[in-house]
Amino acid sequence: MDLKITNQSIYLHNFEENEKRLKETEGKFITDYQFEKAKEIYKDFYDIDCDKKILSLIVAETQMGKTGIIQALTYEFVKNDNINPLNIFILTGLSSCEWVKQTKERFIDIIRPNIFHRNTIGKFAESLKILKDMIIFLDEVHIATELKNEIGRNFLNSGLLNIDNLIERNIKIIQISATPDIALSELYKWDETNYNVSIIKSPDNYIGIQKLLDNNQIFEYKSLTDINNVKEIKQTIHIKYGNNFKYHLLRVHTNVCDSYITMKNINNVFDDDDKFLV
């Protein structure tokens, strides 16, 4: 029995069953929009010189569904490219156990052991040097590829920053970022036949920074250690919402002295009618 084919069959079956179950229970399933974008990105790898195209940069705003697009892309590669799901790795430039936990919850069991943050990449460093036919997703790539951190160093030592090596071993790297300036500048040093850039347009129902600015929901930061700034916050809330009760979160500085002054100011400015908690 071919173990790779078995892994593919298990993955595809579990993926499709999981998506069906989540849609029926209105859980976190992959949307048609995310599947559509994943197919576009997958197709970009095979438009021209497909044997040389080994890198893709996905640019998308924060919290607009990048994880769903990655899930859909893994499905496309396993279904259409004969990729062993055990050869799919998902990394982040962040040092965050919480990110790993949340990401694993979104993926099929067979891929979960291959999800790492930057300080745990050493667990599969040897695999990076020898595996072929591999797909690597790099989230927060502007951090991940810095040579001073673990991911950058391991990529360098494993030959994954060498284009010829990537082509020979059939390794594709898909980078994801909402702030791609550094990644783009590095990418443009490569031959254009080796990469593609996919800029994901946010769906109409996406609420990002620009929409918050347009709706007058973002204000200049001012120190809450100044009681006049706390009074300004209260006035702004009352003008905008009147007696329509809402929850408002005020972030307090971690500095003990500043936090004490801030909480004292809040106590002095807001009265019992505001029903505030400190």
Regions found by a protein language model. Name each.
Residues L94-S95, H117-I121, E140, Q175-D181, ...:
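A short beta-strand-to-loop transition that corresponds to the Sensor-1 phosphate-sensing loop
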Residues S96-H117, W190-Y195:
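Conserved helix-turn-beta segment of the N-terminal RecA-like "Helicase ATP-binding" lobe
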Residues L147-N205:
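Post-DEXD/H (motif II) to motif III coupling segment of the RecA-like Helicase ATP-binding lobe
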